[in-house]
């Protein structure tokens, strides 16, 4: 029996008023996940569109399915009009109906039947104008104001698709559970969007859509695909993300025109050797499955530019990966990889290589050949050192992330390895020294993260890091901050928490662009008066030190929004704290010697949070303290000798 036989007449193949056959090819759109990320399914336009030869293409049919990438028009707005752009009017807008009778941009009002006018409002059908290709006459049609709720509505949609020769059909986000067999009659379809429904299986008749090029089935409950899908020999994009597939359906391996295949977030445990048949693939996403082995078949996919196998259980990669010489993005992060094959060096077009969070103890020296890479990230492995001079060979690198490994020293290769780098992250290693002159060629270096290492001192040439914007030296064993810190006048973020600093140099006042200064958990007793010169400072964190008083110059920090001096030895707060007009959060809790607050604190009108826990404030009644910042400030104001405040 021929599943694809139907009563459709040949007239459905042409919708041009001149009798000219309509052009092949669907409306552009329908992109999905890109580079392993979550993408959408393209714009869903409405209405017909003009072709290059002046004839009219078949319109797109889009049902309202809520907001999202398809973006159908909801309510009583127009579905299309004569002045629609090429990809259809109203697809991306997602606008809702206003409740008024709309008028199309071509001047035609929506038509109402006289009988409808006499019907009660609650039973009167909503009317929308659909521009039919063979005529400029508006055609009334019924449109629900809510997403499709019942599967019988799909039957009507498919009938209309058949009758009007629709090429692009969007039934996404419509709570559909079953696709009826009448889908076989929609022979003009080139794009079909069924994502975000409740579909458990596809009918065999789906194979009748032999013109289909883009099929989006993501976010359903599919466990298999019908064998008849192999008849869709022109299919180029297949999106099966977020389903319940335990294996790659065998029929997929026979879709040899596929260029893009998304299988992310399923339950796939293995990849068959038949994968080698998909030689036209340029993008393959197997992200977030349960795959333990990637066979040699991957090497046959020589046209691949993007391969995402992240978040699986891979322990090894086949040497054949080196045959995929057109790869520009290879994502291997969050696996259990123990090694990387030497053949990786054949991938000379590689720009991005994700190796984060694996079980690597080393990387191959052949990576030197991948000179197009702009980012090198091996965070969360067990690497102790990189191949000698490898980073220097990768002269295009701008970002280097070596955090959460076992480095005891900086990578070998000298200053040349950081020439074009603007961000270096070596957090959570065992490095005890930053080599003198290591950044002498790094003129563009703006971010350095050395948090959670074993540094006891900073290099004498720290003053040459003049372009540094963000410097994180937290959780080390630093005992002194060099005076030359004053030369880092582009610095905006300085984090020195959890060290052994006893004082801050007066030259700190030269860092006029500083926005965040974190000195938490040190041994600081006194802050320099020059702290008041940091007029751009927004966050000052001083908690868990041994500070006995704040300098009066703190009143000059007009942009300060967050001040934490909890767990210190404060005896009082300076009156100048009342000048902090931008202050929103003030932590002064656990200062056992702080017995009173200055009345001037009431001038901090923007204060939203005040923590005074475990401070013996004998002058303020407990019930006032328990009432929160506003009540405390009100009490201070009422009892102030300056009633005019």
Curated annotation (Swiss-Prot):
Keyword Repeat: yes
Chain positions covered by the region annotation Disordered: 1-67, 83-151
Pfam families noted in UniProt: LRR_1, LRR_14, LRR_8
Keyword Repeat appears in the UniProt entry: yes
Keywords: Leucine-rich repeat, Repeat
InterPro entries to which the protein is assigned, alphabetical: Leu-rich_rpt, Leu-rich_rpt_typical-subtyp, LRR-SigEffector_domain, LRR_dom_sf, LRR_R13L4/SHOC2-like
Biased composition (Low complexity): 1-19, 98-107
SUPFAM superfamilies hit by this protein: L domain-like (SSF52058)
Segments of skewed composition (Gly residues): 26-49, 88-97
LRR repeats, residue ranges: 165-186, 188-209, 211-232, 234-255, 257-278, 280-301, 303-324, 326-347, 349-371, 372-393, 396-417, 420-441, 444-465, 467-488, 490-511, 513-534, 536-557, 559-580, 582-604, 606-627
PROSITE patterns: LRR (PS51450)
Segments traversing the membrane: none
Reported function: Acts as a Ras effector and participates in MAPK pathway activation. Probably acts as a regulatory subunit of protein phosphatase that specifically dephosphorylates Raf kinase and stimulate Raf activity at specialized signaling complexes upon Ras activation.
Record-stated family: Belongs to the SHOC2 family.
Protein name per Swiss-Prot or TrEMBL: Leucine-rich repeat protein soc-2 homolog
Record organism: Drosophila yakuba (Fruit fly)
């Amino acid at each position: 029996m021929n599943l694809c036989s139907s009563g459709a007449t040949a007239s459905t193949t042409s919708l041009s008023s001149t009798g000219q056959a309509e052009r092949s090819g669907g409306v552009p759109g329908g992109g999905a996940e890109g580079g392993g990320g979550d993408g959408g399914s393209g714009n869903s336009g409405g209405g017909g569109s003009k072709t290059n030869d002046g004839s009219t293409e078949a319109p797109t049919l889009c049902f309202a399915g809520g907001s999202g990438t398809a973006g159908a028009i909801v309510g009583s707005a127009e579905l299309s009009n004569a002045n629609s752009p090429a990809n259809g009017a109203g697809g991306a807008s997602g606008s809702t109906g206003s409740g008024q009778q709309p008028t199309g941009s071509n001047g035609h009002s929506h038509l109402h039947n006289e009988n409808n006018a006499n019907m009660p409002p609650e039973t009167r059908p909503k009317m929308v104008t659909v521009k039919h290709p063979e005529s400029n006459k508006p055609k009334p049609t019924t449109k629900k104001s809510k997403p499709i709720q019942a599967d019988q509505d799909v039957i009507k949609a498919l009938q209309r698709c058949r009758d009007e020769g629709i090429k692009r059909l969007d039934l996404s986000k419509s709570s559909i559970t079953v696709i009826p067999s009448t889908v076989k009659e929609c022979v003009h379809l080139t794009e079909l969007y069924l994502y975000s429904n409740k579909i458990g299986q596809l009918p065999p008749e789906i194979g009748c859509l032999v013109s289909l090029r883009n099929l989006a089935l993501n976010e359903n409950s599919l466990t298999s695909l019908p064998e008849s899908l192999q008849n869709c020999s022109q299919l180029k994009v297949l999106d099966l993300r977020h389903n319940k597939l335990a294996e790659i359906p065998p029929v997929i391996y026979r879709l040899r025109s596929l260029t893009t295949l998304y299988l992310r977030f399923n339950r796939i445990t293995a990849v068959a050797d038949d994968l080698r048949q998909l030689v036209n693939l340029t993008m393959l996403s197997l992200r977030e499955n349960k795959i333990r082995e990637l066979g040699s078949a991957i090497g046959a996919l020589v046209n691949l530019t993007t391969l995402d196998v992240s978040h699986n259980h891979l322990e090894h990669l086949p040497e054949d990966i080196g045959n995929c010489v057109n790869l520009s993005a290879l994502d291997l992060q969050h696996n259990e990889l123990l090694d990387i094959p030497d053949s990786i060096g054949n991938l000379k077009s590689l720009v991005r290589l994700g190796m984060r969070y694996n079980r690597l103890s080393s990387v191959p020296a052949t990576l030197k050949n991948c000179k197009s890479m702009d980012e090198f990230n091996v965070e969360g492995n067990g690497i102790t050192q990189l191949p000698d001079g490898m980073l220097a060979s990768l002269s295009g690198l701008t970002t280097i992330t070596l955090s959460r490994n076992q480095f005891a020293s900086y990578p070998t290769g000298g200053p040349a390895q950081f020439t074009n780098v603007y961000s270096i992250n070596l957090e959570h290693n065992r490095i005890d020294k930053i080599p003198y002159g290591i950044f002498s060629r790094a003129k563009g270096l703006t971010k350095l993260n050395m948090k959670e290492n074993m540094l006891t001192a900073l290099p004498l040439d720290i003053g040459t890091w003049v372009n540094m914007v963000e410097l994180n030296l937290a959780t080390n064993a630093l005992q002194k901050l060099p005076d030359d810190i004053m030369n880092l006048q582009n610095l905006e973020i300085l984090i020195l928490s959890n060290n052994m600093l006893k004082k801050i140099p007066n030259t700190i006042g030269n860092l006029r662009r500083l926005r965040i200064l974190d000195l938490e958990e040190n041994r600081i007793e006194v802050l320099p008066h020059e702290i008041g010169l940091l007029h751009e400072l927004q966050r000052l964190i001083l908690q868990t030190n041994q500070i006995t008083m704040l300098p009066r110059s703190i009143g000059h920090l007009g942009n300060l929004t967050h001040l934490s001096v909890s767990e210190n030895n404060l005896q009082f707060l300076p009156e100048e704290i009342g000048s902090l007009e931008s202050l929103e959060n003030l932590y002064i809790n656990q200062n056992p010697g702080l017995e009173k607050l200055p009345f001037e604190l009431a001038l901090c009108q923007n204060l939203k949070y005040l923590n005074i826990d475990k401070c013996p404030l004998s002058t303020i009644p407990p019930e006032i303290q328990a009432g929160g910042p506003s009540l405390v400030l009100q009490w201070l104001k009422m009892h102030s000798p300056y009633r005019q405040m």
